[in-house]
Amino acid sequence: MAEEEFSNTTHETFNFTLHTTLGVTTKLVLPTPAKPILPVQTGEQAQQEEQSSGMTIFFSLLVLAICIILVHLLIRYRLHFLPESVAVVSLGILMGAVIKVIEFKKLANWKEEEMFRPNMFFLLLLPPIIFESGYSLHKGNFFQNIGSITLFAVFGTAISAFVVGGGIYFLGQADVISKLNMTDSFAFGSLISAVDPVATIAIFNALHVDPVLNMLVFGESILNDAVSIVLTNTAEGLTRKHMSDVSGWQTFSQALGYFLKMFFGSAALGTLTGLISALVLKHIDLRKTPSLEFGMMIIFAYLPYGLAEGISLSGIMAILFSGIVMSHYTHHNLSPVTQILMQQTLRTVAFLCETCVFAFLGLSIFSFPHKFEISFVIWCIVLVLFGRAVNIFPLSYLLNFFRDHKITPKMMFIMWFSGLRGAIPYALSLHLGLEPMEKRQLIGTTTIVIVLFTILLLGGSTMPLIRLVDIEDARARRRSKKDVNLSKTEKMGNAIESEHLSELTEEEYEAHYIRQQDLKGFMWLDAKYLNPFFTRRLTQEDLHHGRIQMKSLTNKWYEEVRQGPSGSEDDEQELF
């Protein structure tokens, strides 16, 4: 009779040793069960994961829908004194409190759904916002002030990061607040230096403040986000390299080299991608198939972000410069239909992403355990305001030696006051790999408090302050109070400048754009060589086809409006 014994069983093979009465030993080796082709969950675990993902999608869409209704109510009932970002953050806080009560009563557990995931923010929500900012940029005012904007965005952000980071480090060494090492202090100073003056820009547009002030604040905020992310990544890179045995000068030089590589490498990659997209859509005529044309634009819009992140550069910096270049060259190679479609789609997607970010920012108060240290929070707020002042006032006085349009003390004060913090600092704070966990909770809690403090208090009081210091343009003073509108959604306007160079023929471009304008430097080089090389000059046939296409769309719209939903023409007189 055979006796069966199981032995030597491992994850790789199943070994069976059979001993028989004849003394013959037979060892059978059975193959390992096949692994799944993809590392996916199966069975009950897969079903639970699918249910959790479904609830996350449902919850996110529900939050967006409620926020859209809220923005609609702000516009309809003319609650123009309240910026959209402040309203959406407040709604997020309210919804977070309700969810916390539901969880406490054990009616449901939505804790996972309300979590603000940094990877989702950086991969899905932030790229459309940054690309739309670059694509809708008024490039005339931007490049006329590019020197001042770059100085504020790069050197100003670095100054603020060093002031905040250095202050936190030395206060910790003096046992005034919790201790952080040098790299962690600089990482926190870098992430908290990212300004996000969405509410302030809406107020600037509503009150028609000085256009130079508007562009300085807006331009700084666009570049500042990318610079802050690069500085934070630089600090994290130094932490990963364990540079405790390296001298201070070597640390500084390596950090500077890493920053320059990230900044200029990412900017060059984004610029190159934008130029390639212009050449592709210039020589491959997709204007008669707008769906293919639009699809190609969407691909090129996200392409530099993925490539930059894949080769350890800054995807945010790359996608920003790609958006600027594509709006300057590629946009004019598109058909009129795709031009309009691209602008409206980018506005819509950016609005949804911004709304989602601000809503989940409010929800995040209840998302994870907090470590609140009152002295740390107060000193951080003081350092943030002081770092912003050290950034704005000295650089403004320095720039006034070289500027024709001077930055007045009132403008400096508004620029200092408009340094609101948004979702980028919070997402970066969750992305930091700080140890132990109490340190991460302290940084996350402090960042949330600073962000909410600047958005709710500073953002909500910007309009009364502008009224008080009388920084409005002369035309704005003649506007009645009922015309003041703080809704970014309602005041979107035209994203791209009105002069569509692609609508000019070769002769018209030469006669009306180059000869009649006194262009110098890069603007002359761009108008004379770069623009003709990267954009398509229309023939008379192309121009005629474009006009027919737009006329057909206009007639179709008019027919739908004239007939109305019932198909009758009885209401035609009421429309006109």
From Swiss-Prot:
Pfam families on file: Na_H_Exchanger
Reported phenotype of the disruption mutant: The deficient mice have no obvious intestinal phenotype, show no defect in Na(+)-absorption, have normal serum Na(+) levels and no signs of diarrhea. Apically expressed Slc9a2 and Slc9a3 are increased in the small intestine of the Slc9a8-deficient mice in compensation. Deficient mice have a reduced gastric mucosal surface pH, a higher incidence of developing gastric ulcer, and a decreased of mucin-2 (Muc2) expression. The intestinal mucosa in Slc9a8-deficient mice is prone to bacterial adhesion and penetration, which in turn promotes inflammation.
Domain of life: Eukaryota
GO cellular component terms, semicolon-separated: acrosomal vesicle; apical plasma membrane; Golgi apparatus; Golgi membrane; multivesicular body membrane; trans-Golgi network membrane
Keywords: Antiport, Cell membrane, Cytoplasmic vesicle, Differentiation, Endosome, Golgi apparatus, Ion transport, Membrane, Phosphoprotein, Sodium, Sodium transport, Spermatogenesis, Transmembrane, Transmembrane helix, Transport
Catalysed reactions, semicolon-separated: Na(+)(in) + H(+)(out) = Na(+)(out) + H(+)(in)
Tissue expression notes: Predominantly expressed in the liver, skeletal muscle, kidney, and testis. Expressed in both renal cortex and medulla. Detected throughout the entire gastrointestinal tract, with high expression detected in stomach, duodenum and ascending colon. In gastric epithelium; expressed in the glands within the fundus and pylorus regions.
InterPro entries linked: Cation/H_exchanger_CPA1, Cation/H_exchanger_TM, NaH_exchanger
TM region positions: 55-75, 79-99, 118-138, 151-171, 186-206, 256-276, 306-326, 349-369, 374-394, 412-432, 446-466
Location of Phosphoserine modifications: S566, S568
Chain positions found as Phosphothreonine: T505
Topology relative to the membrane: Multi-pass membrane protein
GO biological process: acrosome assembly; potassium ion transport; proton transmembrane transport; regulation of Golgi lumen acidification; regulation of intracellular pH; sodium ion transmembrane transport; sodium ion transport
UniProt GO MF annotations: potassium:proton antiporter activity; sodium:proton antiporter activity
Compartment(s): Golgi apparatus membrane; Golgi apparatus, trans-Golgi network membrane; Endosome, Multivesicular body membrane; Apical cell membrane
Function description: Na(+)/H(+) antiporter. Mediates the electoneutral exchange of intracellular H(+) ions for extracellular Na(+) in 1:1 stoichiometry. Acts as an Na(+)/H(+) exchanger in the trans-Golgi. Contributes to the regulation of pH regulation of Golgi apparatus, and consequently, in protein trafficking and endosomal morphology. Plays a crucial role in germ cells in acrosome biogenesis and sperm development, probably by playing a role in the fusion of the Golgi-derived vesicles that form the acrosomal cap. Can also be active at the cell surface of specialized cells.
Family: Belongs to the monovalent cation:proton antiporter 1 (CPA1) transporter (TC 2.A.36) family.
Listed name of the protein: Sodium/hydrogen exchanger 8
Organism of origin: Mus musculus (Mouse)
Lineage of the organism: Eukaryota, Metazoa, Chordata, Craniata, Vertebrata
Gene behind this protein: Slc9a8
